[in-house]
């Protein structure tokens, strides 16, 4: 029962250190396996149009990182798969659940992508279950990620339908306003929702949304995530597809939600917004910093790889870990 579930979020939790057993943090192994493939980090940039495009996807794949291409260039998906496969790289795409997507999935038999993510806001739906079953029938070797969900019941149903991983998080993201527009979601208790869902899961969980610091990656792993999807921390880089805007001599980049009017092209069923982020440096530099910070997390956990993070103790400190400091 949910009433028995402790409610907390990332800023409420502090992990407790164990004795360090490695000589240098650089010895810590941050790699993760998803399906048949291993990746440098247990993180994936959000499959949003201001976060990833074909060039960013190619760069990530070449450097050994996981990626999920967004679904908003429907006609470009098959050429993208061919582009990646011609270079010996994995193809990881997104689909929706509309009728024409069934025909599209069937058309992929000749050149199936390694990963397909079923990407809708409310993933605990009969339409998602049907699409999982269709993909598994047509492309049995493709790893299927389904979401987004926020309850153990949803995780179990999608897994039982054939999903290889589920994405947990409804509305906790920086440019998502689902909780305000609908009254529903995991905003404000995303980490507790992750813990709740992970206890029911038999397959990998991808935590999606609410990540504000690199330390939140370690916390996500502690509470059951195999992979962590991140939007805002990956937005605003030189390589990011978001439009660059200059305000009073300072450069910013657009970052907007997939359910925003800017993505949809019309103000209809809007559950996302647009913000401007100060322009950052190169994406590779952020990835290196994430890796180094996660290596430090592993050293504090008293382990050699990310599995050690799953077993550390923690305290709930309720909104006090910043102690008046800002990030």
From Swiss-Prot:
Binding positions for NADP(+) per the UniProt entry: 205-228
Job description of the protein: Catalyzes the irreversible NADPH-dependent deamination of GMP to IMP. It functions in the conversion of nucleobase, nucleoside and nucleotide derivatives of G to A nucleotides, and in maintaining the intracellular balance of A and G nucleotides.
Keywords: NADP, Oxidoreductase
Similarity annotation: Belongs to the IMPDH/GMPR family. GuaC type 2 subfamily.
SUPFAM superfamilies: Inosine monophosphate dehydrogenase (IMPDH) (SSF51412)
The protein's name in its UniProt record: GMP reductase
Active site: 176 (thioimidate intermediate)
HAMAP family: GMP_reduct_type2 (MF_01511)
GO cellular component: cytosol; GMP reductase complex
Documented EC number(s): 1.7.1.7
Gene Ontology biological-process annotations: purine nucleotide metabolic process
GO molecular function: GMP reductase activity
Family matches, as Pfam families: IMPDH
Catalytic activity: IMP + NH4(+) + NADP(+) = GMP + NADPH + 2 H(+)
Xref: InterPro entries: Aldolase_TIM, GMP_reductase, GuaC_type_2, IMP_DH/GMP_Rdtase_CS, IMP_DH_GMPRt
Keyword Oxidoreductase: yes
Keyword Plastid carried by entry: no
UniProt cross-references to Gene3D superfamilies, sorted A to Z: Aldolase class I (3.20.20.70)
Naturally occurring in which organism (per UniProt): Streptococcus suis (strain 98HAH33)
EC category name: oxidoreductase
Tree of life domain: Bacteria
């Amino acid at each position: 029962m949910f009433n028995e579930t402790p409610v907390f979020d990332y800023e409420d939790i502090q992990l407790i250190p164990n004795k360090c057993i490695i000589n240098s943090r650089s010895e810590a192994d941050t790699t993760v396996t998803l399906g048949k493939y291993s990746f440098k980090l247990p993180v994936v940039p959000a499959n949003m149009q201001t976060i990833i495009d074909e060039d960013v996807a190619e760069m990530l794949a070449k450097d050994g990182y996981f990626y999920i291409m967004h679904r908003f260039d429907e006609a470009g998906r098959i050429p993208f798969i061919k582009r990646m496969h011609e270079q010996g790289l994995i193809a990881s795409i997104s689909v929706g659940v509309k009728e024409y997507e069934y025909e599209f999935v069937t058309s992929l038999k000749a050149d199936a992508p390694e990963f397909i993510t079923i990407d809708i806001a409310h993933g605990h739906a009969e339409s998602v279950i049907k699409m999982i079953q269709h993909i598994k029938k047509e492309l049995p070797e493709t790893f299927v990620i389904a979401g987004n969900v926020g309850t153990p019941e949803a995780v179990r149903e999608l897994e039982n339908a054939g999903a290889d991983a589920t994405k947990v998080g409804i509305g906790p993201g920086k440019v998502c306003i689902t909780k305000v527009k609908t009254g529903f979601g995991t905003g404000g208790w995303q980490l507790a929702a992750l813990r709740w869902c992970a206890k029911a899961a038999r397959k990998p969980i991808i935590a999606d949304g609410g990540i504000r610091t690199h330390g939140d990656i370690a916390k996500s792993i502690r509470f059951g995530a195999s992979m962590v999807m991140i939007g805002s921390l990956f937005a605003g880089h030189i390589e990011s597809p978001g439009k660059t805007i200059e305000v009073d001599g300072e450069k910013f980049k657009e970052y907007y939600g997939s359910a925003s009017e800017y993505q949809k092209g019309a103000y209809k069923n809007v559950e996302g917004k647009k913000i401007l982020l100060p322009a950052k440096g190169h994406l590779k530099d952020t990835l290196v910093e994430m890796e180094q910070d996660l290596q430090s997390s592993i050293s504090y956990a008293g382990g050699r790889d990310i599995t050690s993070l799953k077993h550390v103790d923690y305290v709930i400190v309720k909104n006090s870990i910043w102690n008046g400091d800002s990030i």
